[in-house]
A protein has these predicted regions:
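Active-site HxH/HxHxD metal-binding segment of metal-dependent hydrolases
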Residues: 114-190
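Sec-dependent signal peptide recognition
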Residues: 32-38
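Short, Lys/Arg-enriched N-terminal segments with co-localized hydrophobic residues
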Residues: 8-30
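Bacterial N-terminal signal peptides
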Residues: 38-45
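Metallo-beta-lactamase
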Residues: 161-209, 214-269
Length: 269
């Protein structure tokens, strides 16, 4: 089982890396790195080891920010100095905003929508992959923080006009008074689909509750991959030490429990 974090930070300062982590039966964490060359290495494509076929799903990792970013260590509270030194994170922790594009069963599915900043790379990268905004069939929302939905609306209009927008009902109910969420829901109108955990979703995508970072934070499984939103903000720290929370986690106790549950699930598989 492979896990993809939409706050795609890494354990090394490299330009536009893609990291997935596996956990083997002995609790040993290994990092697998894929770096694509071409078009500024902004897009990563992950497929099975046997080589892609015309019908084989493809998962593209798109880095929304055009340059590497670093989060200050202070966002994670009091981290012991010896741990900081051993992890070499005294100068901050690498971070990025990422969007996943899944090509499966003849459909194009996005997971979250990036931050929508002027320098966003989402639309240019989709264009390079051969897709216009109108080609996106569905968008699955992990949670409704601005850096995950900001790229879905522009000038009060949907950026992806043909897409169904799948939002976990627990998450949407928690943010009904937020102006940016109201704008999002109004823009997509009848294309907004509220769903509960356990509901059937397109292309066999499975939603799983991972509450804590936000009230209804949701992760998604597609085949042997997990797309886990903001379950972790700092892989370098939180993979081995999941009790550390970023300031962004709204309910620290639940966020820790969700992190540990995901890590345990991957370890079992």
């Amino acid at each position: 089982l492979e896990v993809y974090n939409l706050s795609g930070n890494s354990m090394e300062l490299e330009i536009f890396p893609i990291f997935a982590f596996n956990i083997n039966k002995s609790n040993h964490y290994t990092m697998k790195k894929t770096i694509t060359l071409g078009l500024a290495a902004l897009i990563g494509v992950l497929t099975s080891c046997g080589g892609p076929t015309a019908t084989e799903p493809k998962l593209h990792v798109i880095f929304d920010n055009p340059a590497p970013r670093t989060m200050p260590l202070s966002l994670f509270g009091e981290v012991p100095s010896d741990l900081v030194a051993s992890l070499d994170i005294a100068n901050g922790i690498p971070s990025s905003v990422s969007v996943m594009l899944l090509e499966k069963d003849g459909q194009q599915l996005l997971f979250d929508g990036g931050n929508g900043n002027e320098d966003s790379r989402l639309l240019p990268c989709l264009q390079v992959l051969g897709f216009a905004p109108s080609d996106i069939d569905a968008i699955f929302i992990t949670h409704l923080h601005g850096d995950h939905i900001g790229g879905l609306v522009k000038d009060n209009q949907p950026v992806f006009p043909q897409a169904k927008l799948y939002i976990p009902s627990v998450e949407l109910d928690a943010w009904t008074q937020a102006p940016n969420v109201q704008t999002l829901v109004t823009a997509y109108g009848e294309n907004v689909v509220k769903f509960a955990i356990g509901d059937a979703l397109p292309c066999g995508v499975e939603a799983m509750a991972a509450y804590g970072h936000s009230p209804g934070h949701t992760i998604y499984r597609t085949d042997d991959k997990l797309i886990v939103g903001d379950i972790m903000h700092a892989l370098a720290l939180q993979m081995e030490h999941p009790d550390f929370c970023a300031r962004f986690d709204m309910d620290h106790e639940k966020a820790i429990a969700s992190r540990k549950a995901v890590l345990e699930q991957v370890k079992k598989e």
